Amino acid sequence: MNVSKILVSPTVTTNVLRIFAPRLPQIGASLLVQKKWALRSKKFYRFYSEKNSGEMPPKKEADSSGKASNKSTISSIDNSQPPPPSNTNDKTKQANVAVSHAMLATREQEANKDLTSPDAQAAFYKLLLQSNYPQYVVSRFETPGIASSPECMELYMEALQRIGRHSEADAVRQNLLTASSAGAVNPSLASSSSNQSGYHGNFPSMYSPLYGSRKEPLHVVVSESTFTVVSRWVKWLLVFGILTYSFSEGFKYITENTTLLKSSEVADKSVDVAKTNVKFDDVCGCDEARAELEEIVDFLKDPTKYESLGGKLPKGVLLTGPPGTGKTLLARATAGEAGVDFFFMSGSEFDEVYVGVGAKRIRDLFAQARSRAPAIIFIDELDAIGGKRNPKDQAYAKQTLNQLLVELDGFSQTSGIIIIGATNFPEALDKALTRPGRFDKVVNVDLPDVRGRADILKHHMKKITLADNVDPTIIARGTPGLSGAELANLVNQAAVYACQKNAVSVDMSHFEWAKDKILMGAERKTMVLTDAARKATAFHEAGHAIMAKYTNGATPLYKATILPRGRALGITFQLPEMDKVDITKRECQARLDVCMGGKIAEELIYGKDNTTSGCGSDLQSATGTARAMVTQYGMSDDVGPVNLSENWESWSNKIRDIADNEVIELLKDSEERARRLLTKKNVELHRLAQGLIEYETLDAHEIEQVCKGEKLDKLKTSTNTVVEGPDSDERKDIGDDKPKIPTMLNA
């Protein structure tokens, strides 16, 4: 047989691998091993031919230990020489060797044809050992891709002993003993593992030829079908879709439950009625509003009473009025009297930077109220979300109001839920919100009158220790225009001031101090004043006081002081004797004259060039009053009975010029009246100014005495530090040359 016929070319190997892809590991490994051993067989036969022809190969070199060196590579095997036969008969030796060579070639071909048969390999190993070629046994056994068995391992161990690799032979023997002991326990398992893995499974350094190695990898070309490609894309798209959905849902969950957006959820805004002890008896000064809300309480307590007669209570109640009049207190009292849950929110709590949060909070609030009906929903500062809509506004800006309108329409009239809103600007609310069917009942909570103020003062005075001289009625008459909150603050300020003075009770002087602080501002006792500035302030306030005292139709004088309060160096305060709901033209002119009194007094004393900027606030107030007379009250002869205040820009320039000129004329006329009166009352002006310099603060009765030149039973006082002004102040020496008023005597 020609050895070259069994050589396997790379092209043939590649084609076979492509055709037999399912059996790629076994077929590929067998072909590679057959190719390698075909090359070795060709050289082996050449060696035997040279030996038979009488040409001996060179002798092997021995190492220093005397043992023959053996290499597992093909080159070392080709150059090696088998040891001489041990028989002495040369002819017999030559015959046996020749026979052995022929048999070796035959057995090698059989072993190469069936590399997966351990029996064929064992027979070839035995023949090699008989021919004294142990190095070929070792080289072939260690070649990947050749089958092995315990018998082959024993022959391999014997070959290792012959070539002097005793340590490796001992390792093989130890592995055989281990395999035999495992076979005693489970023979089927041991035989199965031996047949499948062979010797190479017992040595980690050796690899399995069926799966290739890093040194000799298997090159594979796989042709995928259309179904495989489509299925792979579907798999990746499915995985990508699942991951995308999971990520989006996770992000949504995180954003909805983190601190940043957790506030978008409406918390439980209900108030435990057991902890709300506010009743209608605690609400004073607004009897009419309380009577309106008593109907709501009756409905919440017994709704069947109204259902039987077909009556329907309003779905919403709107409380309007100035700040501090008790709108929130009325809503709490309504819930306390009815004994139902009370939900409250401010109008500004609905909207945030995120779009849609306001509408969601409206829905959640009403859902909570429905689940705990009967209940009351109170929305304070309703104008924050219920303002008039503008077609130019963005859609998201109207979502909260639209949702509120829907919730109000969705209410059942017998559901036991009442919504109460409160606002200081009812004119700013959207008309759709206040129409019948929504906030269809409007309750005006106005400022208390004198009787209401007295009731409020009595209610708050129950909590403090009062002196016998305290009369709430007198305080009520002296505090017109004060709201319930301001009256409560007045009582508290008086009690605190009495404690600071170590008083055993709160008397009228403490209430007067608290009233002055609220009406005129806090005293600025630490302010440093020049003598000229203090004197100018005294004449300025004296001018106001003289005009208020001697002008027909002016509001009665309350107090005048040159003690700095708030932002003013001095103040002249007027209080009406009764609550006023309207004003006449004569009273408006009197207001103008009183405002002009301070400026004219400074002009009369110091000249026009030395008037101060303290007149600015007076002129602002006078201009506002004069403009209202012309544009709102119809008190102008030139303009006539026309209201110009609304849509001022829509009026013609001529009408507006006439109105402006009329305002200026009213102010000039008032200035002339004030100049005539102060010139006439010049003595009283100087007396009152001197009295203010000496006593700082004078009430209406004391002002009357000072103007008449009477002696005051009062200590002189100067709260602020007074220093000498600079020489550049032209007012410094003005008035010093005039004689002192002889009636102003030291107390």
UniProtKB/Swiss-Prot annotation:
Q: List required co-factors.
A: Zn(2+)
User: Which residue intervals are annotated with compositional bias (Basic and acidic residues) in the record?
Assistant: 51-64, 728-740
SUPFAM superfamilies from the UniProt entry = FtsH protease domain-like (SSF140990), P-loop containing nucleoside triphosphate hydrolases (SSF52540)
Q: Do you know which Pfam families this protein is assigned to?
A: AAA, AAA_lid_3, Peptidase_M41, Yme1-like_N
Q: Which residues are noted in the entry as ATP-binding?
A: G321, P322, P323, G324, T325, G326, K327, T328
Q: Any idea what a deletion of this gene does?
A: An increased rate of escape of mtDNA to the nucleus, no growth on nonfermentable carbon sources at 37 degrees Celsius, a cold-sensitive defect in growth on fermentable carbon sources, lethality in rho- (cytoplasmic petite) cells. Decreases processing of ATG32.
Q: Name one GO molecular function term.
A: metal ion binding
User: Does the UniProt entry include the keyword Nucleotide-binding?
Assistant: yes
Q: Where in the cell is it found?
A: Mitochondrion inner membrane
GO biological-process terms attached to the record = membrane protein proteolysis; mitochondrial protein quality control; mitochondrion organization; protein catabolic process; protein folding; protein import into mitochondrial intermembrane space; protein import into mitochondrial matrix; protein maturation
What else the UniProt entry mentions is: Present with 20100 molecules/cell in log phase SD medium.
PANTHER family for this protein? ATP-DEPENDENT ZINC METALLOPROTEASE YME1L1, METALLOPROTEASE M41 FTSH
Please give the name of this protein: Mitochondrial inner membrane i-AAA protease supercomplex subunit YME1
**Which species?**
Saccharomyces cerevisiae (strain ATCC 204508 / S288c) (Baker's yeast)
Q: Could you tell me the gene encoding this protein? A: YME1
